[in-house]
């Protein structure tokens, strides 16, 4: 159970465990929802790592072009930045391209090939543990971690991967939504 893991941590053991949650901050809320005492959480948890796998844009058929105005506004990526867009084909387009011999050999028209990790590390320091003790919401704790500790959220990490031309904005939106 969650509490027995924290009991082991209190005795000096290094404990790694898995918890299903949407972000590192919601993991803490999940533990509190499991009736783990706040004092135990504050005294034993040092950090929480959230991770997601994003599909990598295909290097064989991905399209590099300037970011759209809408995407730039939604993401904060500079307007003229060149980013990759997936060349996803419909079933009919795949069939026709296969017949013509022009279907991408790397991804078979999916637009993506392989996966890459996106990570969010929340380090629990005095500010964060005090915020939890004070009953701050998950969003408020996340905002505090971003502002005070320079934490990158899953979405922000994903957008860095977009800037590095490793994935697409639509993939980050699909996988790293905060709801």
Regions found by a protein language model. Give the residues of each.
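Short, flexible helix-loop junctions that flank or precede catalytic/ligand sites
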Residues: 1-179
């Amino acid at each position: 159970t969650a509490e027995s893991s924290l009991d082991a941590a209190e005795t000096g053991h290094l404990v790694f465990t898995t918890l299903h949650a949407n972000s590192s901050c919601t993991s803490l809320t999940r533990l509190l929802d499991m009736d783990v005492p706040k004092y135990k959480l504050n005294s034993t948890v040092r950090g929480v790592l959230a991770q997601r796998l994003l599909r990598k844009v295909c290097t064989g058929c991905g399209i590099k072009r300037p970011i759209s105005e809408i995407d730039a506004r939604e993401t904060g990526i500079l307007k003229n930045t060149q980013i990759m867009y997936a060349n996803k084909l419909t079933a009919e387009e795949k069939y026709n391209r296969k017949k013509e011999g022009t279907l991408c050999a790397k991804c078979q028209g999916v637009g993506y090939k392989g996966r890459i990790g996106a990570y969010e590390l929340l380090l629990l320091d005095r500010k964060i543990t005090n915020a939890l003790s004070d009953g701050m919401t998950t969003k408020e704790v996340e905002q505090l971690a971003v502002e005070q500790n320079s934490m990158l959220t899953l979405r922000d990490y994903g957008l860095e991967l977009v800037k590095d031309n490793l994935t697409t904005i639509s993939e980050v939106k699909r996988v790293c939504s905060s709801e």
